[in-house]
A protein has these predicted regions:
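Rossmann-like NAD(P)-binding element
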Residues: 1-46, 53-54
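NAD(P)-dependent Rossmann-like dehydrogenase/reductase catalytic/cofactor-binding core
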Residues: 108, 139, 144-226
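AAA+ ATPase "lid" subdomain C-terminal helix
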Residues: 127, 137-139
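Structural signal for conserved beta-strand scaffold positions within catalytic alpha/beta enzyme cores
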Residues: 5-7, 69-70, 112, 216
Length: 226
């Protein structure tokens, strides 16, 4: 049996690596860490799956800060193999290697960060794209439907096979540089939530969970979408 369930920390006495997946509140995480430290004498690493909290802040709540790191999976984790591995300033390299080896054994694709940054790797890239997409809609350049269609039918499929820097080298850095020189001045550099999103937040239109967001989800087949 691959999974077993318990409500007692005492049942974790033989555990060496813990993945923490509790709510994104430091006080709650700290209490879990204290219980783990008290009940896991063979502990090698605590890996938080947080999508937002810095490993430095996580480490403040434990006695064994050298064992703490972030191992952030990407949704949906049963389909998408990426796990971002982020250390704090005191994380033991052996702890990182132990977690990385376990993740790779489970078929995960481990992406290492040399130092923490808000949003880690994937969300920083993704939200830069979100910002530009919203800007294009606000400027009347195109609608949400055509942006989504373009992504699904252009570089979305391409980047399942190659990475950004693979593409840079394939296209040629001289060509990439010429495009950037022409394009960068025209890109969005907003540093706050854009009106297109804020107006929907103010109306309570949050997306699928409320039935309406950018799109009207009330008449869509959600089982098919999922």
């Amino acid at each position: 049996r691959r999974l077993s369930f318990t409500e007692s920390y005492q049942d974790l006495a033989d555990v060496e690596i813990v993945f923490e997946c509790v709510t994104e509140k430091l006080a709650v995480k700290y209490e879990v860490y204290h219980q783990i430290e008290a009940n896991c004498p063979h502990l090698k690493a605590i890996a938080s799956t947080t999508s937002a909290i810095s490993p430095a802040d996580l480490a403040k709540g434990v006695a064994t800060r050298e064992k703490v790191m972030v191992a952030h999976p990407y949704n949906p984790p049963h389909i998408v193999p990426c796990v971002e591995l982020v250390k704090n300033d005191f994380t033991d390299p052996e702890a990182l290697e132990a977690v990385s080896a376990l993740l790779e054994h489970c078929g995960r694709e481990v992406c290492w960060m040399n130092k923490p940054a808000p949003g880690f790797i994937a969300n920083r890239l993704q939200h830069a794209l979100y910002r530009e997409a919203v800007y294009m809609v606000e400027q009347g350049i195109c609608g949400p439907e055509d942006i989504d269609k373009c992504i699904r039918s252009s570089w979305g499929p391409r980047y399942t096979s190659i990475g950004l820097f693979d593409h840079f080298d394939y296209a040629g850095l001289d060509l990439i540089s010429s495009i950037e020189t022409y394009l960068y001045p025209d890109l969005c550099n907003d540093t706050a939530v854009q009106p297109f999103i804020q107006e929907r937040l103010d109306r309570g239109d949050l997306g699928y969970k409320t039935g309406v967001g950018v799109y009207d989800w009330r008449q869509r087949d959600m089982d098919d979408f999922r």
